[in-house]
């Protein structure tokens, strides 16, 4: 599986991952939207939210 693996304001990067899922973890604050992308499907702790998906580059 090929997943995006970058944080909010960084240039987009991809990585070939062993697992079958990619994730996008994010938090919305009053001033900005912060996100992080990577391989797998980690459990998010409040106030973060995680979206997991299966498919190459699905975590845009």
Curated annotation (Swiss-Prot):
Belongs to the three-finger toxin family. Short-chain subfamily. L-type calcium blocker sub-subfamily. Keywords: Calcium channel impairing toxin, Cardiotoxin, Disulfide bond, Ion channel impairing toxin, Secreted, Toxin, Voltage-gated calcium channel impairing toxin. Disulfide bonds join 3-22, 17-39, 41-52, 53-58. One of its GO terms (cellular component) is extracellular region. Residues 41-48 are annotated as: Important for binding to L-type calcium channels. This is Toxin S4C8. This specific blocker of the L-type calcium channel (Cav1/CACNA1) is a smooth muscle relaxant and an inhibitor of cardiac contractions. InterPro entries: Snake_3FTx (IPR003571), Snake_toxin-like_sf (IPR045860), Snake_toxin_con_site (IPR018354), Toxin_cobra-type (IPR054131). It is found in: Secreted. Its main location: secreted. GO terms for molecular function: calcium channel regulator activity; toxin activity. Expressed by the venom gland. Gene3D superfamilies: CD59.
């Amino acid at each position: 599986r090929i997943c995006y693996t970058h944080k909010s304001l960084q240039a987009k990067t991809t990585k070939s991952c062993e697992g079958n899922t990619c994730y996008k973890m994010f938090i919305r604050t009053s001033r900005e939207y912060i996100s992080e992308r990577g391989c797998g499907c980690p459990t998010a702790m409040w106030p973060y939210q995680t979206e997991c998906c299966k498919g190459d580059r699905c975590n845009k």
